[in-house]
Amino acid sequence: MRKYYSLYGRLLDKQRLHEAFRHVKRAKGAAGIDGQSLSAFAENLDAELSRLLLELKEKRYQPQPVKRVVIAKAGGGERKLGVPTVRDRVVQQTLRCILEPIFDPGFHPSSYGYRKGRSCHHAISKAQLFIRRYDRRWVVDMDLSKCFDTLNHDLIIEQFREKVTDGSILHLLRSFLESGVMIGVEYEKSSVGSPQGGVISPLIANVYLDQFDQHMKNRGHRIIRYADDILILCESESGARHARSVATVYLEETLKLTVNMKKTHIAHSSAGVKFLGVDIHTGFTRIQEQKVKTFKAKVKQITSRNTGSNLDGVIRELNPVLRGFVNYFRIANCKGVMKALMRWIRHRLRAIQMKQWKKPSRLHRRLRQLGYKPPFKWIKMRSWRNAASPLAHYAVPNSWLHDEQGLMDMAGVDVGFSVSVI
């Protein structure tokens, strides 16, 4: 195994720091505990990078604690994020660019999370392949409790030391791990974990969990991992139970992680295997119901009839949400779901337009402009039911919403495809 001795000098390059900032800026993100935004950092970019470079050269650089941010999970519960300052993100990104090419080529081939050229679609397609072509239809869905928050610092450094012997790099890596967390005005030490939200945390997690990947491979088990989402695909139920036992022992005893046995399941693909937002069945893949509910909640928020925006503005805000949803879930067999969702969305948009017209006379004028002849039925303009009436469809036809207003049509996107397995 090749060892890397002198890497710290690669950090001491202003151009590298500048490229790292460009990456951090593209990723966006909130300010850390110092309150400095990306735009404020950019205003004094040369001075900020010069100061960082000097601190790194003199080895005076010390990361600041991350800012605790709590966000709600779609399925309930909370996710704790740690937001580093902009300057710390720049150093982390530079460090990541140095270390990633050293470790990534050796990762398990079925590891897909946070790796260049790999995606959720590749992971799902690999699971489909194992289930449908290789008859590995008994699947263990491993659930790790607070994986990122419980990574053992000594084991992290030990893993990096296998290839990196530069003490200054390892010291810098540990300083990020031990920088602590600010929860409001209270400081909390960080004796374990690598906070979600850190630029280098995904690489740390992949290096850490690759030990598990390789252990399972050496034992003859087929796995697919995306970050801390793990599937073990087996030929029989007894094989799945054995694989679960092997995995649990290694994860808990060697890697010091906690397997949530209540959420770790063994399932046959005929009943559906939950993975990365989809249910993978023996013959088809569908979107998980919770993901559809979360999507509809977002659409409802944008298309509230109490919105102050006109229909043009609503559609402009809505389109990126529709595009993101269908682009992710197009790997599923979801043509019917997309058609039903578009009918529901158009109904909501018609309800907005009807309410903004306020008076039936405006509706009737619109119908006459489109060539319809009176008399027209007098209807309540604020009624949700009437937004589905024939008059509403005549006045606000599908073609007008899509062709003239530019509403993205999820039902018009090809779905049910698989990407090439890598």
Predicted regions and their residues:
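N-terminal alpha-helical targeting/anchoring segments
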Residues: 1-47
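A conserved non-catalytic segment of reverse transcriptases
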Residues: 178, 254-323
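Short, solvent-exposed helix-loop connector elements
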Residues: 111, 189-193, 300-315, 324-337, ...
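Core structural elements
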Residues: 12-17, 65-69, 74, 177, ...
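A glycine-rich phosphate-binding loop feature that marks nucleotide/adenosyl-phosphate handling sites
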Residues: 264-271, 317-321, 338-346, 361-370
